[in-house]
Amino acid sequence: MSKTIAINAGSSSLKWQLYQMPEETVLAQGIIERIGLKDSISTVKFNGNKEEQVTDIPDHTTAVKILLNDLIHLNIISAYDEITGVGHRIVAGGEYFTDSVLVDEKVIEQVEELSALAPLHNPGAAAGIRAFREILPDITSVCVFDNAFHMTMQKHTYLYPIPQKYYTEHKVRKYGAHGTSHKYVAQEAAKMLGRPLEELKLITAHIGNGVSITANYHGQSVDTSMGFTPLAGPMMGTRSGDIDPAIIPYIIERDPELKDAADAINMLNKKSGLGGVSGISSDMRDIEAGLQEKNPDAVLAYNIFIDRIKKFIGQYFAVLNGADALVFTAGMGENAPLMRQDVINGMSWFGMEIDPEKNVFGYRGDISTPNSKVKVLVISTDEELCIARDVERLKK
């Protein structure tokens, strides 16, 4: 038996989950927030308990020390060396990595080099890797890449219809994201359906604050909605998703608040989507409250959101030449029955029917009717477990 910790580090946060492996038992989980700021917060949840402390955590190395000391103080572990593996979630792995890898200095440097593809994620992830290597230099350390699952896409799918020099010289292409989540829920869907993953055609819809849809053919990603960056695809919580690129120079010329392309991209990433259109919130619960109040901006934002998700699902039915199941996962995918119902409404031609009672009452699993030709599943994603499994796989 061994203990493995899954890490999701950002620029100012470090989310973690500790597992007993190979049993896959969660021993504890938590998050350290406001790294580098005053009044940092460390939260640990274990055995139904919750411990929280407020202190100053200037950097990721200090954060890791506090995390490990908390585990000892709370008797979750008795010594550092009980942890034999650590897995780090990396958003952007570019074309360097088609699978999870053991960490060495070259891997860390490549993660840092790819920060342009994920400026909010890769630098923090690299800092987290270095912190663990400094404090626990002898444990198995693994990088798990969000886009690696999508590296099975064919060239005609991942290349953009622009001059090829931008790919050959600058590696501009579709990379995708949320791959760890899409991989996990596809595996769970196969178990739920009682069929080998290698014979299934699945459409997996990761719908949280970030939204991505993936076409999965026999266990492999053949297309996905996120692109060169996670900005592409359907409308999201604060991201616009796909727009006509000519809009960017047009609005820069006319909006004095947008000084350059970086400002415009920031607006598309952080001030658009549900929040930007509604003017209310990026949270679907607030949007649904707006629907009840018949707020016209909430109604408009919601309708755009549903429309864009439907279109990607329809595309992937075409890409796969039909599907065995549609899987909803992540925050909204798992917890927004109205959204699921409205996505499915009007898609009866594809052979999908959901049971209203199963859908509304938070049923996890198959929410489709017995007559539904395409099964509709709700599956809780578990990216952390997927990371821990990859650590165990690479230990052997």
From Swiss-Prot:
Residues that, per the record, bind substrate: 89
Entry's Gene Ontology cellular component terms: cytoplasm
GO molecular function, one term: magnesium ion binding
Coiled-coil features, chain-numbered ranges: none
Cofactor(s) essential for the protein: Mg(2+); Mn(2+)
Gene designation: ackA
The protein, known as: Acetate kinase
Active-site residues (renumbered): 146 (proton donor/acceptor)
Record's function text: Catalyzes the formation of acetyl phosphate from acetate and ATP. Can also catalyze the reverse reaction.
Domain of life, per lineage: Bacteria
Marked site positions, Transition state stabilizer: 178, 239
Organism in which the protein naturally occurs: Streptococcus uberis (strain ATCC BAA-854 / 0140J)
Chain residues that bind ATP: 15, 206-210, 283-285, 331-335
Catalysed conversion reaction: acetate + ATP = acetyl phosphate + ADP
Keyword Metal-binding annotated: yes
Residue positions binding Mg(2+): 8, 383
Subunit annotation: Homodimer.
Similarity-based family: Belongs to the acetokinase family.
Alphabetical GO biological process terms: acetate metabolic process; acetyl-CoA biosynthetic process
Note accompanying the cofactor annotation: Mg(2+). Can also accept Mn(2+).
Gene3D superfamilies recorded: 3.30.420.40
Keyword hit for Magnesium: yes
Principal localisation: cytoplasm
InterPro entries named in the record: Ac/propionate_kinase, Aliphatic_acid_kin_short-chain, Aliphatic_acid_kinase_CS, ATPase_NBD
A Pfam match: Acetate_kinase
